[in-house]
């Protein structure tokens, strides 16, 4: 929402896309959170106003974010798929009206354990697949908007590799040295 404060946990391709979405929606502050500080330059290029690495702080990351904002963020987005990070994203939200959105998919058969008071105070916790859009209707609109240059994807493409180097592309992704690779045939 316009003028809001957002925190994005995870700076892979999806997290960086969330940053672009927050910027397009008019967020006034976008805090990027990742344990790989090498990703911060790209996050700032795409709209993050602040970048923090949880490893650089003694306090839990939700307390760091509350300290940075004075009250917690309006919106948080967890795009990693880690249970602990999902709870931290919720706890980083403003206690009366903050909204936390889980985008990252955890490994199968994991349960979330959290303090229910995180919700009783007024926070909202929701999940989202495909950005909450209905693919039948939304994909054509998304493609049309891209073709009209309403948003750019080129900054997310970090490598172009021949198909014969597909394994190298996965290695780059796992090492955190790639956002998205395009394979050529």
From Swiss-Prot:
> Which residues participate in NAD(+) binding?
10-15, 34, 39, 103-105, 180
Report which superkingdom the organism of origin falls in.
Eukaryota
EC top class, in one word? oxidoreductase
Q: Which InterPro entries does its entry note?
A: ADH-like_C (IPR013149), GroES-like_sf (IPR011032), NAD(P)-bd_dom_sf (IPR036291)
Biological process terms in GO annotation: retinoic acid metabolic process; retinol metabolic process
Q: Which GO terms describe its molecular function?
A: all-trans-retinol dehydrogenase (NAD+) activity; zinc ion binding
Note one Pfam family from the annotation.
Answer: ADH_zinc_N
Q: Give the UniProt entry's GO cellular component terms.
A: cytosol
Q: Where in the cell is it found?
A: Cytoplasm
Q: What Enzyme Commission number(s) appear in the record?
A: 1.1.1.1
- Tell me how the cofactor is bound: Binds 2 Zn(2+) ions per subunit.
Keyword annotations: Cytoplasm, Metal-binding, NAD, Oxidoreductase, Zinc
Cofactor(s) required, per the database record:
Zn(2+)
Q: Which PANTHER family is this protein grouped with?
A: ALCOHOL DEHYDROGENASE (PTHR43880), ALCOHOL DEHYDROGENASE 1A (PTHR43880:SF1)
Listed under subunit, the entry gives: Homodimer.
Q: Hey, which family's this protein in?
A: Belongs to the zinc-containing alcohol dehydrogenase family. Class-I subfamily.
Protein's UniProt name: Alcohol dehydrogenase 1
The uppermost taxa in this organism's lineage are:
Eukaryota, Metazoa, Chordata, Craniata, Vertebrata
Name of encoding gene: ADH1
